[in-house]
Regions:
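Short, electropositive alpha-helical surface patch
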Residues: 102-114, 192, 196
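Short beta->alpha connector loops
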Residues: 36, 94-97, 118-123, 244
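Amphipathic helical "hinge" segments at domain boundaries
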Residues: 36-101
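Short, well-ordered alpha-helical microsegments
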Residues: 100, 123-127, 246-249
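Short acidic/polar active-site loop segments enriched in Thr and Asp
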Residues: 5, 51, 113, 174-175, ...
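Bacterial carbohydrate/catabolite-sensing allosteric modules
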Residues: 33, 76-85, 131-139, 144-330
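N-terminal helix-turn-helix DNA-binding module of bacterial transcription factors
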Residues: 1-51, 327-330
Length: 330
């Protein structure tokens, strides 16, 4: 009658602080109407865990399976779950409605104990649903909704963006551009802000024409990239928010006879296999994607087995890996 999952009912009975007051009232009203009484003895004797964690991916299937970040994070989650004798299952779809239906089906049937969301986006209806239903979830990425009640694992992407830009500055670059993912993704917005912070610190004016954003890092982004390279005063270095996008940049540079790193230095993020497979190999910020997954799984299982733990946030450190795509300004 309350239209919520069995785990939400269980957590309401235990007065879990992660369940909203509105949801608690809805569940308790339905319990009264049904004449339901909690059997605390049975609850203590019998585990209600399914020992399964749902992993929620973004709606774009192509981008997910081409992006090493998601694959490494899933590898970390699976590795830790196996150690703790939990299972994990992937939830995705062609669009948000399809993902929501899958989440509803899994949670109401008691097939999962909680969800790890592998991305963080502003005004996300999936997060709205998870929170309103009192479902246990953890974000990989910074929480922008229900921040005080949300568990999340993240990098300090502001600092990472600043560090990448500072590295180029120390090589003598002053005409530094930014090429990134859509800023509705919180990691991309923070990396861009970090880039701007580094410019401001050194008194370098921010040039809007030196910034380009793309909706799909694995799509055809030739136009956006060319707009940066064909400026009246072209940049001597570019901070790129993702290794995959940096590979596209290298390809367009090759087509336009722009030499890397002699004409253009490139620094990117994720330190994926792609960064090591290009020529020249990419200097990249390692965000420790697998460790993000491990930490998310660890926190999830801790909160499943100890429901009254308060929401926490964990920051996983990043590391700059120097390779061949950057040099001192000529």
């Amino acid at each position: 009658m309350a239209g919520v999952s069995p785990s939400t009912v269980s957590r309401t009975c235990k007065n879990n602080p992660s369940i909203s007051t509105e949801t608690k009232e809805k569940v308790r009203k339905a319990m009264i109407e049904l004449g339901y009484e909690v059997n605390f003895q049975a609850s203590n004797l019998a585990s209600q865990y399914s020992r399964t964690i749902g992993i929620i991916l973004p709606a774009s299937a192509r981008e997910v399976y081409e992006n090493a970040f998601y694959l490494e994070a899933i590898r970390g989650i699976s590795h830790y779950c196996n150690q703790r004798q939990y299972m994990s299952t992937v939830v995705t779809g062609q669009d948000e409605d399809e993902i929501l239906k899958a989440i509803q089906s899994m949670s109401r049937s008691g097939k999962v104990d909680g969800f790890i969301v592998l991305y963080s986006r502003k005004d996300d209806p999936i997060i709205d649903y998870l929170f309103s239903e009192g479902l246990l979830y953890i974000l990989i990425g910074k929480a922008t909704q229900y921040t005080n009640q949300t568990l999340y694992i993240d990098n300090d992407n502001l600092l990472a963006g600043e560090d990448a830009t500072e590295y180029l500055y120390q090589l003598g670059h002053r005409k530094i551009a930014y090429l990134g993912s859509d800023s509705s993704l919180t990691f991309a917005a923070d990396r861009k802000t970090g880039y701007q912070m580094a410019l401001t610190k050194h008194g370098i004016p921010f040039r809007p024409k030196y910034c380009a954003e793309v909706l799909n890092v694995s799509g055809d982004n030739t136009e956006a990239i060319s707009s940066l390279l064909q400026q009246d005063e072209p940049p001597t270095a570019i901070v790129v928010s993702d290794d995959i996008l940096a590979i596209s940049l290298e390809r367009v540079c090759l087509q336009n006879h722009v030499s890397i790193p002699d004409d253009l230095s490139i620094i990117s993020f994720n330190n994926s296999l792609f960064a090591r497979s290009t020529s020249p190999q990419l200097t990249s910020i390692d965000i420790n994607s697998k460790q993000l997954g491990i930490e998310a799984a660890s926190q999830m299982i801790n909160h499943i087995e100890n429901p009254n733990l308060v929401a926490t946030k964990i920051i996983v450190p990043h590391q700059l890996i120097e390779r061949d795509s950057c040099c001192k300004v000529k």
